[in-house]
């Protein structure tokens, strides 16, 4: 119906997590609901669990409790293994099903020239590398974007 919208929630219940050998949990019985349309930032000192929380959302660690996710998650930074390849080839390796027109749209918004795609990734500056990888992330549809320390 016109005017209606669908609110998708990440529903976290009784989340408890601790690293092996830790004296106390990082998260203890956490309950939280996050609307997937929200744009949120976690601010805190080093070692306070921000990256751990994102990795829990990505199912990188075992935990107690439940995390119900209505959409797939996409995590940044990407893990780049080979810096010597042409940038476009690298992007195809990182996200095989991306659509070039969406990537080009995001590149335009981030003011990245299209010639960047045809240069070896290694020759890009650190800022260019970050921007092209963010453009790839932003080009994904129907995903919750988890961005960890993008600078």
Language-model segment annotations:
Residues 145-149:
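Catalytic Walker B motif of ABC-type/P-loop ATPase nucleotide-binding domains
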Residues 134:
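Hydrophobic anchor residue at the start of the ABC signature
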Residues 51, 128-131:
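Conserved ABC ATPase nucleotide-binding domain "signature" region
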Residues 120-124, 128:
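Conserved ABC ATPase signature
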Residues 36-45, 51-103:
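ABC ATPase nucleotide-binding domain signature region
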Residues 137-144:
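A short, proline-enriched helix->beta-strand linker immediately N-terminal to the Walker B motif
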Residues 105, 112, 116-120:
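Interfacial catalytic loop of ABC nucleotide-binding domains
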């Amino acid at each position: 119906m016109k005017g209606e919208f669908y609110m998708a929630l990440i529903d976290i219940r009784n989340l408890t997590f601790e690293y092996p050998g830790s004296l106390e949990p990082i998260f203890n019985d956490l309950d939280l609901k996050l609307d997937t349309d929200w744009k949120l930032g976690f601010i805190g000192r080093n070692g306070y669990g921000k990256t751990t929380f994102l990795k829990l959302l990505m199912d990188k660690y075992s935990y107690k409790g439940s995390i119900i996710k209505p959409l797939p998650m996409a995590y940044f930074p990407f893990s780049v293994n080979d810096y010597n390849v042409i940038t476009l080839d690298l992007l195809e390796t990182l996200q095989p099903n991306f659509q070039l027109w969406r990537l080009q749209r995001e590149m335009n918004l981030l003011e990245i020239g299209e010639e960047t795609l045809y240069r070896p990734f290694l020759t890009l500056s650190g800022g260019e590398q970050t921007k092209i990888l963010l453009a790839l992330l932003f080009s994904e549809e129907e995903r919750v974007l988890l961005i960890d320390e993008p600078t």
